[in-house]
Amino acid sequence: MKKTLSILMSFGLLFSANLKNEAISFPSKVISSEGNNINVGKLTEGSTVIIITIKSPSCPVCQTQLIRIGKQLDNFNKCNVTFLVLSPGTSKEVHQVKLTTEFPFPFIPNDDLLISKALGLLLNPQQILPSIIVLNDNLTINWIQKGRNNIYFGDDELYDYLDCDNWI
């Protein structure tokens, strides 16, 4: 019974994509793993802001996803996007993921997990539910894809949602 419940919960996490929840907002200002202040509100004025959450700094599937998206940046750049990566862990741990993946966008340490909790993405006291979030200009969630595993990353779904091929 426990195994069946676990499988059903996994499918629930895997296929809970495209949910809208206008009541939740991302913080307007955050600090990167390099100590830089980031005005997220300002970023949304000039581009579509996409938040990639990773389960933990040691999550290999999450790192693979960042590398996959990094290889597709020419396609994503067609629709004027910028990424932020939200991860549990210290600045040092999170920055190491940035260096390892060579993902060229800011990484946001969420050591206290307050942002993840506010977004409803807390898996446990040390981990975030891996997700992709597209923000509205007012920092609320426009689109969210929850869940990730070694055969399902969600980046294709994001690209389809953004419809970058039809941008002028």
Predicted regions mapped to residue ranges:
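Short acidic-hydrophobic, aromatic-tinged amphipathic segments that line or gate anion-handling sites
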Residues: 106-110
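Structural micro-motif
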Residues: 104-105, 123-133
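N-terminal "domain-start" segment that seeds a small globular fold
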Residues: 16-42, 64
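Sec-dependent N-terminal signal peptides
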Residues: 4-13
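Structural microenvironment flanking redox-active thiols in thiol-disulfide oxidoreductases
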Residues: 63-102, 113-117
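Thiol-/selenol-based redox modules, centered on thioredoxin-like
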Residues: 129-168
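Short active-site neighborhood of thiol/selenol oxidoreductases, capturing the structured segment around
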Residues: 43-63, 67-69
